């Protein structure tokens, strides 16, 4: 089941973009929005506000990638770091396992894997050119054991 909705920030001045048009496409995205909105170390954040062009190898055309999040973080050493964050279920961060029979579902998964790899390659280049970091966060980072929020992967970049 997919959970989508509109997010209303409690700190709209921190939001880079129009704070009245923030939408989440999963509860993980919403959880990360709350984290960005309420965390004092997050100085600025945006959701799908950056556009990164990427070449999709399957059709040879340039497409537009809207990463889930942009954040500007004040690290514990008081240095500022900018990051682009993609929130994905862990199963989509690994190549699909080939079944005994090639199904339509498997073919679709292979296509999506290829598309994601192209997007993430261009996102890494985009970030490298701008002295930023690119991170992919999964449910293991956002909801370990489904008990509480743990952003240890993100905190590693805050120090």
Predicted feature locations:
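Catalytic cores of nucleic-acid endonucleases
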Residues: 87-147
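Acidic active-site catalytic centers that drive phospho-/nucleotidyl reactions
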Residues: 68, 86, 158
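Active-site metal-binding core of divalent-cation-utilizing nuclease and nuclease-like domains
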Residues: 21-24, 46-83
